[in-house]
Amino acid sequence: MFGGKGGMGNLMKQAQQMQDRMQKMQEEIGNMEITGESGAGLVKVTITGSHSVRRVEIDPSLMEEDEKEMLEDLIAAAFNDASRRIEETQKERMAGVTGGMQMPPGFKMPF
């Protein structure tokens, strides 16, 4: 049924290897930093692979200098709030799909 002697053991070994590779990949992605730009580089947001904002940069030509730091902090906070809300929405929708069955910790939707 599973390819002869040892077939089931090999299948389980392959599944474990795949799980290990996926976990390593998720850790690598989580440690990445990616910068997005808008306005031809006038606004830059750097986030981690886990969607946490690391840095927000706004060209001073877009505002008064004394408000720059506060605006940067507000943009970062708004982005983090939106990211948190997306995670909550995904969990709620997933609960509807799975009939309320709890998913393992760290389980992410494929999209």
Curated annotation (Swiss-Prot):
Location of the protein in the cell: Cytoplasm, Nucleoid
Renumbered residue ranges of the record's region Disordered: 1-23
UniProt cross-references to InterPro entries, sorted A to Z: YbaB-like_sf, YbaB/EbfC
Subunit structure and binding partners: Homodimer.
Purpose: Binds to DNA and alters its conformation. May be involved in regulation of gene expression, nucleoid organization and DNA protection.
Pfam families for this protein: YbaB_DNA_bd
Highest rank taxon of the organism: Bacteria
Alphabetical UniProt keywords: Cytoplasm, DNA-binding
Source taxonomy: Bacteria, Pseudomonadati, Pseudomonadota, Gammaproteobacteria, Vibrionales
Disulfide bonds, paired cysteine numbers: none
Any one Gene Ontology molecular-function term assigned to this protein's record: DNA binding
Main location: cytoplasm
Protein name: Nucleoid-associated protein VSAL_I1086
GO CC annotation, single: cytosol
Family stated for the protein in its record: Belongs to the YbaB/EbfC family.
